[in-house]
Amino acid sequence: MIELEKIKYFKYLLFSSLYFSQGLLMAVGFVLVPLYFVEQGISPAITSIIIGIALLPSIIKFIWGGIVDYFIHLGRKKFIILGVMLLSGSLIIITFIQPSVALIPFTFFLLLSVCGWIFLDVSADAWAIDVSNEENRGKINGSMHAGQYIGMAFGSLFLGFIAKEWGYNISFLIAGLFILLIIVLPLLTKESIKTKKRQKMMPKIIEEFKKKDTKLVSALSTFAFISRGMLIVVIPLFLNIYLKLDVAQVGLIVAIFTISSAIGALICGALTDKWGRKKALYIFFGISLILTLGIIITNTWLIFTIIYALIGFLQGGYLAAVTALYMDTTDPKIGATQFSIYSSFGNFGLTGGQTVSGSLVTLFGFSLTFFLAALMFAPALIVLYFINLKKGNKK
């Protein structure tokens, strides 16, 4: 068995591979499934409802975290393996289900794959908290999110090619088998289980969320990702409607953005360990605000691509820094629960940004929408100012 303490860089490979599998599922769910449904004659309205149903487990992520923490005496690795098996198995099963004929079974197993993803996600986060410290959490989070971005890019390009050449069913099968292979790394890794009995969860959760910094980090989590959510929806529309780019050109620019985000997560994750969380986030948020405003004056695809790639680089950076801050302020005994609560606040901000952005474009146009997306970093910077990391945390 491999001991994480003895092989210095193995933990980065382990956690990046686990997040790579999540990136593959995101490519399947957000790229392949919608296109597959179009091919099957299923309307966009039904498609969005099905994807929304499948994503329901992610909205109550803290419940899955609570389950993992309640059974802390079993360790984190068992739940990671359970998540991988559930995720992989569900994707393999939907290979044999035609949604135009059996939409409900297809939806059920797609939802089951997301359940596996969430189990994998909260368990991997908790394990990372257990085996990391403030000196390397930026690098660990950077490697995790880089793995996720690479998984999304790989899934969109490679699985998209497979779907085009041999059909969507084969692409789902290959995605499931790829994810199943990832189970090898956690199986080979030795886990040190420090708590040998079940624990009472609620008193610890209440105690943690009475703390001022915990409340402020929750607020920061919400504000930090609103702009990101807005850009996810608005950018493809901007490229198609304003810059007159076709689907292939939009896909290429999005791929460049994804690769830039992966690089940013790795480099900026290391920088946040060196500079400290607050200083790094001031820089990442501040420059992101300026660059988002810069989109307003963009009138060519080349200038836009450069600005958008830089925004992606910084998005990867502040994602790594914010999640490192989550870990710094999380009690390891309720690591899965507290981290997933922070993440739920982040998902709320992300989803809120996605939800309102289309309406903002319709009502006010692209320029004002980009201005508002940039402005969303202002409350994040204000909340960050009031976070007073205690001695032992990165400042």
Ranges and model annotations:
Residues 78-93, 279-294:
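Structural signature of the two symmetry-related core transmembrane helices
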Residues 2-58, 215-216, 220, 224-239:
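Helix-loop boundary and gating motifs at the non-cytosolic
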Residues 1-9, 191-219:
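Juxtamembrane intracellular "pre-TM" segments in multi-pass secondary transporters
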Residues 60-74, 163, 264-276, 361-362:
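Helix-to-loop junctions at the C-terminal end of transmembrane segments
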Residues 96-109, 296-308:
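Helix-loop junctions at membrane interfaces in 12-TM secondary transporters
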Residues 118-132, 317-331:
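Intracellular juxtamembrane helix-capping segments at the cytosolic ends
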Residues 44-45, 134-143, 247-248, 332-342:
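Loop-to-transmembrane helix entry/capping segments in MFS-fold secondary transporters
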Residues 333-362:
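A late C-terminal transmembrane helix in Major Facilitator Superfamily
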